């Protein structure tokens, strides 16, 4: 595993325990592109891996070029659709688009994520494949006993718990989420909002919570290693993203049987059950809030793991397919 950070990752311990190796490079800052390129050259000359599977779009042309020069089979993997911000799209395209001339194979979490990163031509080729972002479905299995136990553990008995899992970035649109939740609170006295994740905008979101006087209604739980429990703690999942490659947490929420109220940025491939409602971001917070509460009046929760398995999003299935793919290219 090759990371562009010196910070310990959430999965480092598990990777090392399973026998994996972790290498670190400096974060990409723009001005250090050529220094990183030289480091890539040195690294792949001394580490002759047979397959390199790249997940960092903007630098993928550089490190996959160096890997291919040392006889690696080069895979590039798109996990996100285009940003809604023009300058971000332009910069990303300039840095990443050359990978279409370098990579041997192209993966994406959805057709749209593939088209946005690689173009329409690539996604029609035989060396492109949608590789679903899978989960261990059974970890999210819902039961009323599990739900009530978690409610008691977190002191949320008698509360209607709205939940969100995601980094605090512009893409996740937490500000609008808080606007929606504020409108919900005006109509629902027992509403609570749980925010799971970290990110550069976390402090600014906390200030908004304070300014809205929602401090006793919103809890920040940081990064968690028990997301399946979080999904079983929640009563409602709300996801107001501006853009998403797929919307993987929406799949996790469906596995736990949650009613999911998401933005139209969520891809069709991520909707695998009949308890997801997509609302346009053009709607104001009042319309979101009223629509959510109206749907909840008639919702009956049940376990959703079979929906996930049927849709091919269970990790045990995908791990086998990816293993076969790697073995066929060694």
Indicate residue ranges for each PLM-predicted region.
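N-terminal strand-loop element at the rim of the active site
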Residues: 1-35, 127, 200, 325
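Short hydrophobic beta-strand element within catalytic cores of glycosyltransferases
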Residues: 2-4, 250, 259-263, 268
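Short His-centered aromatic/hydrophobic patch
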Residues: 54-62, 78
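A short, active-site helix/loop in glycosyltransferases that binds the activated sugar's phosphate group
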Residues: 102-141
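A short helix/loop element that forms part of the nucleotide-sugar donor recognition site in Leloir-type
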Residues: 141-155
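A conserved mid-protein helix/loop that constitutes part of the nucleotide-sugar donor-binding site
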Residues: 160, 164-183, 200-207
């Amino acid at each position: 595993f090759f990371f562009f950070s010196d910070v310990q990752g959430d999965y480092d311990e598990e990777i090392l325990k399973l026998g994996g190796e972790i290498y670190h490079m400096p974060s990409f800052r723009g001005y250090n592109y050529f220094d990183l390129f030289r480091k890539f050259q040195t690294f792949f000359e001394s580490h002759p891996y047979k397959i390199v599977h790249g997940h960092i779009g903007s630098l993928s042309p550089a490190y996959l070029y160096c890997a291919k020069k040392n006889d690696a089979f080069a895979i590039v993997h798109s996990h996100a659709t285009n940003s809604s911000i023009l300058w971000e799209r332009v910069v990303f395209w300039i840095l990443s688009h050359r990978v279409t001339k370098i990579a041997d194979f192209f993966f994406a979490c959805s057709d749209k994520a593939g088209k946005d990163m690689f173009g329409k031509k690539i996604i029609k080729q035989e060396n492109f494949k949608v590789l679903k972002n899978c989960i261990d479905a059974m970890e999210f299995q819902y039961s009323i006993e599990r739900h009530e136990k978690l409610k008691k553990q977190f002191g949320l008995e008698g509360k209607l718990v709205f939940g969100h899992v995601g980094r605090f970035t512009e893409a996740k649109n937490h500000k609008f989420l808080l606007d929606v939740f504020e409108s919900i609170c005006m109509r629902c006295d027992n509403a609570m909002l749980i925010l799971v994740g970290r990110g550069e905008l976390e402090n600014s979101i906390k200030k908004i919570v304070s300014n809205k006087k929602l401090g006793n209604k919103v809890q920040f739980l940081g990064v968690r290693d028990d997301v399946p429990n979080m999904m079983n703690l929640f009563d409602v999942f709300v996801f107001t993203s501006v853009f998403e490659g797929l919307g993987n947490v929406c799949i996790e929420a469906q596995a736990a049987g949650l009613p999911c109220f998401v933005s139209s940025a969520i891809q069709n491939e991520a909707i695998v059950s009949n308890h997801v409602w997509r609302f346009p971001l053009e709607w104001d917070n009042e319309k979101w809030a009223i629509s959510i509460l109206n749907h909840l009046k008639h919702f009956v929760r049940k376990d959703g793991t079979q929906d996930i398995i049927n849709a091919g999003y269970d990790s045990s299935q995908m791990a086998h397919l990816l293993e076969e793919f790697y073995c066929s290219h060694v």
